[in-house]
Amino acid sequence: MNTIILAIDTATPAVTAGIVKLDGIEVLAERVSIDARAHAEQLTPNVLAALADAGLTVGDLGAVVVGCGPGPFTGLRVGMATAAAYGHALGIPVHGVCSLDAIGIESAGTVSEVLVVTDARRREVYWARYRDGVRIDGPSVNSPVDVPGAAEALARPAVYPTASGLVRAVADFSAEPAPLIPLYLRRPDAKPQQPAVTR
């Protein structure tokens, strides 16, 4: 298997694209833009810039890893559709991972237990709890007061999924990837309009 991986995440305000060499999880290049409203506009330029920074082209890629949330509808669709398009066009596998896992797995070996919390908007948070980098609870969406330790976690500086975390979150690159399924964890903000009642 070609060991050059494109890692993408658009589940948070960060628009992440990175090129990772699977051997040793070596990040060759990574581009991150923080803009919750510009995932579609920034993802492809970030991917192309990361490839250029690494001195590679899309033809050098052996697989794609994409964060599947939890996150907002539009943000997730941008990342997942882009990952699927690269996979289809290049004939390479696309592995979906929980975006919170990409953050939690980076804590392995540094702290025994960590709570990963991201903004779910509408005064709610997405969260999952990890022990030694392995998810032990979640992912879920709740009000911060309903998540033990969330207030403390929210007081810390923001951390977003990284290219290395996304790649580390894939359990087995030799296995057939599961279908990409977004982790919305709640109903969309937009609702179908009810027909007008006439009398």
Enumerate the language-model features and the residues they cover.
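DPxDG-like acidic metal-binding loop motif
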Residues: A63-V94
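Oxyanion-binding and handling regions
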Residues: M1-E26, I34-Q42, H95-R199
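Phosphate/pyrophosphate-binding loops at sites that engage ATP/ADP/AMP, CoA/4′-phosphopantetheine
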Residues: V47-A63, G149
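Generic structural marker for isolated residues within well-ordered, non-membrane alpha-helices
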Residues: V47, A83, G104
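Generic beta-strand hydrophobic packing signal
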Residues: R31, L61-V64, L183
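A short glycine/serine-rich beta->alpha loop
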Residues: A29-D35, C68-P72
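Short, well-ordered alpha-helices that flank and scaffold nucleotide-derived cofactor binding pockets
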Residues: A49, A84, H88, G109, ...
